[in-house]
Amino acid sequence: MSKEKFERKKPHINVGTIGHVDHGKTTLTAAITTVLSKKYGGQARAFDQIDNAPEEKARGITINTSHVEYETPTRHYAHVDCPGHADYVKNMITGAAQMDGAILVVAATDGPMPQTREHILLARQVGVPYILVFLNKCDMVDDAELLELVEMEVRELLSQYDFPGDDTPIIQGSALKALEGDEAYQEKIVELANALDKYIPEPQRDIDKPFLLPIEDVFSISGRGTVVTGRVERGMIKTSDSVEIVGIKDTVTTTCTGIEMFRKLLDEGRAGENVGVLLRGIKREEIERGQVLAKPGSINPHTKFEAEVYILTKEEGGRHTPFFKGYRPQFYFRTTDVTGTIELPEGVEMVMPGDNIKMLVTLIHPIAMDDGLRFAIREGGRTVGAGVVAKVIK
């Protein structure tokens, strides 16, 4: 059997379900695939197919995640669902499954619960740009006023974490009833799909973003100059483009005088490609792995930032013991380790393996960074944690 070709006619959007345990995230995921496959084509996935999430490794961390896809008339969606709370935390922090938007599932019978709050906070910290709400189990609540109260509570909670609570689409429904074939509740799933189409804007493609290439290797070619190699993370570069070398040392501006891939000369290098970039007037020793090549003015070097971090358990190959304030591990950004010190939130004395925590990090060298950049925490080359830059301080 030949593999069917993935037709990319429609824009592709990454979404996922978040919310408190047992509020119906997986049931909703199954309901969406079931209802939309009937209406628009695609593959229906049963609850147990989604619930038995396969293990994946992201940055050395084991995460259970289910991936499903579905279509609306205008878009193709890739949707992630995680079985356990810890999987959500790891998924969001490592960026294993980047989300352009999230569907927050809240059971109308319970209202917002501790993990509801925690997932909204995580979404804010790791830069999930849009949240929609599916108010689930509405068939079990007879009182319309009660539904209204729960809705208000959810809106207030979203606003607390800087999401536009008042303007957030909230769809009232029942995932289970929709799965069982109840037409009125299936219509609510279609309504949710329409809301996804309308509320989550089409994300900017990597190729349209400003050029950035993390430098992996540097060598000099006699008579031609210095070449840096790496994979273009975003944007594109053309011969004679002006570029900045950012991070670790003072920022330097230079010009790209040639681009090559597999020993062939190219006119341009694009997002996703491994290329060598020839730089004008730069000596081999002026540049090192861990710096980035970037479009001038598009990214700055920083040493201090607030981070959201997950610390690996012993079983995941992490530390066996807690760490305390003044802990000095290495922070691995893109292609290199930089030593840094940490400050813990007030009232937190120690961090245990398996915890997720907010911390303030100060690096000994500046690194090119923006909010949302992922990193690993390492001790002597062994990964002990994963993190994301929540907010650059300086």
From Swiss-Prot:
Q: Where is this region: G2?
A: 60-64
| The keyword Lipoprotein is annotated on this UniProt entry | no
Please tell me one Gene Ontology term that the record gives under cellular component.
Answer: cytosol
Q: At which positions is Mg(2+) bound?
A: T26
UniProt KW keywords: Cytoplasm, Elongation factor, GTP-binding, Hydrolase, Magnesium, Metal-binding, Nucleotide-binding, Protein biosynthesis
Record flagged with keyword Cytoplasm: yes
Where is region (G5) located? Answer: 174-176
Intracellular or extracellular location(s): Cytoplasm
Region G4, annotated ranges: 136-139
Q: What is its EC number?
A: 3.6.5.3
Tell me the protein's name: Elongation factor Tu
The record's region (G1) falls at 19-26
Species of the source: Hamiltonella defensa subsp. Acyrthosiphon pisum (strain 5AT)
Q: Where is the signal peptide?
A: none
Matching entries from InterPro entries are given as: EF-Tu_GTP-bd, EF-Tu_GTPase, EFTu-like_2, EFTU_2, G_TR_CS, P-loop_NTPase, Small_GTP-bd, T_Tr_GTP-bd_dom
